[in-house]
Amino acid sequence: MIADRDGLDALTMRRVAQELGAGTMSLYWHVRNKDELIELMRDEVAGEQTLKEASGDWRSDLARFARDTRGVFLRHPWLASVAWGTPPLGPNSLRQDELTMAAMSSLGVDPQTRGAVSATVYFFVIGFVLRELAQEQVQRRTGVTIEEWRASVAPYIQQQLATGRYPNLQRAISSGGDLDNDAAFEFILNFILDAVAAQLPKQRR
């Protein structure tokens, strides 16, 4: 996919036509413009979600939805940049929305609350992935990994902590090393799901 390789800026009707070996104008028989093409692309990748039916365990299903969504965004880096807009309304997207709502049916809460929980998880995933993608872009641009950057700034950080002006920051840094992205994702996801569970009647947690 052009957007996967080169980003959305490289996605033009002419470029798509070249990839397909077709005339540019012939594409307009199928899609009206680039925005409509992107909506079709969003719906296509929504079909990569592996959650096919609700298991009855809301926590397990929401965690799976979050991990799947992160995976889709990382495989298609362009997707996170358009995910804040209007939701896609294609069949794959609507099916995933339906499954997500069904997965939360065992929460025993009203539809509005289900929507809020779903949005909280979804927006967390988007924000987390945007951070991951930004790190990758910096690494490609500078040739410096996040580990190498941390090592390079460590003397400065230690110098600042030694002043005693940042006791809370010092305790946080001294408590252990930074989590890698996978571990950080799971930690925050479980924190969110714990917060949701804490709002439920005991029998539904």
What spans do the regions from the language model cover?
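C-terminal peripheral helix-coil segments that are non-catalytic and often amphipathic
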Residues: V109, A134-R205
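Hydrophobic alpha-helical connector segments
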Residues: T50-R95, P111-Q112, S118-V121
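Short amphipathic alpha-helical interface segments enriched in basic and hydrophobic/aromatic residues
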Residues: A46, T50, R70-L74, S105, ...
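A contiguous pocket-lining binding segment that forms or flanks enzyme active sites
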Residues: L99-E148, S152
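Alpha-helical structural segments
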Residues: M1, D6, E36-L51, S60, ...
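Helix-turn-helix
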Residues: I2-E36, L40
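Amphipathic alpha-helical interaction segments
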Residues: E36, R64, R95, L99, ...
